[in-house]
Amino acid sequence: MNKEGITVAGNLIADVVYTIDVYPQKGNLTWMRNPVAHTGGINNLIIDLARLDSKIPIKVSGVVGDDENGQFIVDSLREYPNINIEGIVKKGRTAVTFAMTEKESKQRTFFFDPGTSLEFNEKQIDFKKIKADIFHLEYLLLLGTLDQPDEDYGTKAAKVLATAQKYEMETSVDMVSEEGNRYQKVVWPALKYTDYCVVNEVEGTGVTGIQLYDKDGIKEENM
């Protein structure tokens, strides 16, 4: 890697984790206890990279709200001198994930409020400011505006990745595991302009249409 580092773009999210007694049936009540705030979304990757090597420049591109959660995210990133937050736009309400963890089973259930993160778009990305060796975008299928169709590139995200390549950056993407058939509409166009793609087995099945496992386990013939 050269000295220009890595740019990470996408969903900047605040996570609030609660412990609950049990997950309630519809219409019923349960107690929520011990809320703990964490950074989520691309924040975790950014901080991990900054910790991994303090000499690697890390640049951020995304949207947070002009609110307490947005300031929490910005402050958490400011703790690392090799993280450049000039590419963060403040607007509206910060995206928040509320995670409910059952006390006994430790099973987690997630409630996501996207806030204005869905409005993150190519016009808010200053490629001259965030020029790097690698441009990483996540999460496809959770990007709102960038997941929308584009006449020339297939999706807005694909256009962003193509632009990053024009600035001589290698491109990388990650996505969320989603039920449904949006993978081919949203992910396929982006892959044309992607050098590195990170997927799990659920996402791999969604993208390729090849079933990797069923109720009986892994389908060895498709591996």
Name every feature range the model reports, one short phrase each:
Residues 43, 67, 92, 201-202:
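Alpha-helix N-cap/helix-start capping motif
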Residues 1-63, 68-78:
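Glycine-rich phosphate/adenosyl-contacting loop at the front of the ribokinase-like
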Residues 1-14, 71-89, 96, 101-223:
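Ribokinase/PfkB-type carbohydrate-kinase core domain
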Residues 63-66, 91, 176:
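Short beta->alpha junction loops/turns
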